[in-house]
Swiss-Prot record:
Statement: the UniProt record of this protein carries the keyword Cell wall biogenesis/degradation: no
Record organism: Aspergillus fumigatus (strain ATCC MYA-4609 / CBS 101355 / FGSC A1100 / Af293)
Residues bearing the modification Phosphoserine: S101
Protein name: Large ribosomal subunit protein P2
Protein keywords: Allergen, Phosphoprotein, Ribonucleoprotein, Ribosomal protein
Species classification: Eukaryota, Fungi, Dikarya, Ascomycota, Pezizomycotina
CDD domains named among the record's database cross-references: Ribosomal_P2
Gene3D superfamilies reported in the protein's UniProt record: 1.10.10.1410
Record-level GO cellular component terms: cytosolic large ribosomal subunit
Amino acid sequence: MKHLAAYLLLALAGNTSPSSEDVKAVLSSVGIDADEERLNKLIAELEGKDLQELIAEGSTKLASVPSGGAAAAAPAAAGAAAGGAAAPAAEEKKEEEKEESDEDMGFGLFD
């Protein structure tokens, strides 16, 4: 991710085709060592591609990924299908919560 961020920073600054040396210079300016193998792979993957198109394509792919309630609904449906097996697990969680609340011995750090 750090390599991609440096590459995009260079592209936004006007360098239309940043080299691995350019990316290394950006990373070293903030004290980060570049991973040569990953950097070369990134440069090879992005070579000749329009960054704006890649960003737009990535945004549409991210928009199609379910998040929030949809991800939580699937496990809930699976738990409802299991029936009685979910009830003991819920009781165990409640017991654990009580034990954790006793650990502060009545002194709330952020009360």
